[in-house]
Amino acid sequence: MTEWLSWLEANYADELEIMLRLCAAAFAGMAVGLNRDIHDKPIGMRTLGLVSLASATVILSGSVYDDLHFAQDAVSRVIQGIMTGIGFLGAGAILRGKDGTEVHGLTTAATVWIAAALGVTAGLGAWFMTIAGTLMALFLLTFGKPVEQRLTRLFTAKKKSAEDDD
């Protein structure tokens, strides 16, 4: 095959690995997003799946060229760029109430960030970190609010009883 068409040659082991990483990223983001859909939040499974997939795609984009070997600092800059850009997307999910005191959407913004981070870890092939991060995110999204509410009630009740004793 002529040299200018050599990029069409398939290396199925590498392509299978890339596909596995992209699927892992998409499914990790979708798992977090499904939780958001269940709780009727504005950013859900499709959005977070796409955010995670996009992050993995950016990380993997350099790996398809055998001639290119990225230095650790170059990968670090790509990750920093992803996370900064995702911060702007997450900021769009944060809303203030009419009186300006209530803030809504912070957890949704954080889920956009974790979906991006899961995409980065999947893109890098850090399988344990991708799975552990997905499970931890789901744990926090599922049980975080009830635990937070109980602890808040517990500590505000203790604070109130201490103030009453004074």
Model features per residue range: what roles?
Residues E3, W7, A117, L135-A137:
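Transmembrane helix-bundle core of multi-pass membrane transporters
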Residues A56, L60-S61, G81-A93, W113-A126, ...:
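Mid-bilayer segments of alpha-helical transmembrane spans in multi-pass integral membrane proteins
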Residues L106, F128-G133:
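Hydrophobic alpha-helical membrane segments of integral membrane proteins
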Residues H104-I114:
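Short hydrophobic alpha-helical membrane-embedded segments
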Residues M1-V78, L124-G125, T130, R150, ...:
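Alpha-helical transmembrane segments and their membrane-interface boundaries
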